[in-house]
Swiss-Prot record:
Identification of the protein by name: Large ribosomal subunit protein uL23
Family: Belongs to the universal ribosomal protein uL23 family.
Annotated organism of origin: Methanococcoides burtonii (strain DSM 6242 / NBRC 107633 / OCM 468 / ACE-M)
Biological process according to GO: translation
A GO MF term: rRNA binding
Subunit (UniProt): Part of the 50S ribosomal subunit. Contacts protein L29.
Length: 82
């Protein structure tokens, strides 16, 4: 099961990139370990922490913090967000 569905792009999420964090919408059945493993497998950067939250609309979001400096900007550039 691929836990990550798509990146969550808002103005607040873009500001979090300066703190080396990215937000993703994930499968509602996915746990933090699955999200971490998928991020490492897809993008090749080590993950410092994963925080998950469920919105009132029923979406599950994951806030991923990276160990490497500027990893969030590098991933955002690869995806085409920046």
């Amino acid at each position: 099961m691929n836990a990550i569905r798509y990146p969550f792009i808002t103005e607040k999420a873009m500001m979090l990139m300066d703190e080396n964090k990215l937000q993703f919408v994930v499968d509602t059945r996915a746990n933090k370990t699955q999200v971490e493993n998928d991020v490492v497998k897809m993008y090749g950067f080590t993950v410092k922490s994963v925080c998950t939250m469920t919105t009132m609309k029923g979406l599950k979001k994951a806030l991923v913090t990276f160990n490497e400096t500027d990893a969030a900007h590098e991933i955002a550039t690869r995806i085409g967000l920046v």
